[in-house]
Amino acid sequence: MIAAPMQEGDGRRRSVFRPCIDLHNGTVKQIVGGTLRDAQDGSGGDDPHALTTNFVATHPPSYYAKLYARHNLRGGHVIKLGPGNDEAAASALQEWPNHLQIGGGIHLDNAVSWIERGAEKVIVTSYLFPECRFSLERLLALEKRVGRDRLVVDISCRRRGSEWIVAMNRWQDLTDMRVSKGAYKRDREREREADNESQSL
């Protein structure tokens, strides 16, 4: 669960809760950021010595989706942290169709199928950064496939010195995108370019 501070019109601050269902090996977990890493033996699995969790659920993901639906906690997401989570993610989406976003391994070829399985929106990061470099072409293609209203671009960052850099692949790989006021202005220009380009698609 994430508590995001928001400001009322009268200047007072309040918290808006964003429910999360983070899945690792089919189980709901709260993992300490940056501790989910690939194993060094080339097996394709996770490094068990690096992984640190704050919470490992005994209930299935569908339980939490049903709980969020009962309390009308909107704006939540289901994140698949690695392989082996598709079935668990689908079970959560089915409990509250069109109200939970889905992320983790989303790309051009599977985005629509997750919408069809009940996701309100798809969340994407790694697909937009081939070789860790941002691809506007991929973003436009994905927008055309699912529609802008169904697409969320995750720019989770890691700090390096005084900079915040967008990270991908379970926060292991740093991309070429820095988050700053200057980058925001450039992204606004890119967004205008994307608007013009998408109109001609």
Task: Give the location of each predicted region.
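Hydrophobic faces of well-ordered beta-strands that scaffold small-molecule active sites
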Residues: 16-21, 76-78, 98-104, 122-124, ...
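Intrinsically disordered, low-complexity terminal segments enriched in Ser/Thr
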Residues: 188-200
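N-terminal basic/disordered segments at the start of proteins
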Residues: 9-26, 30
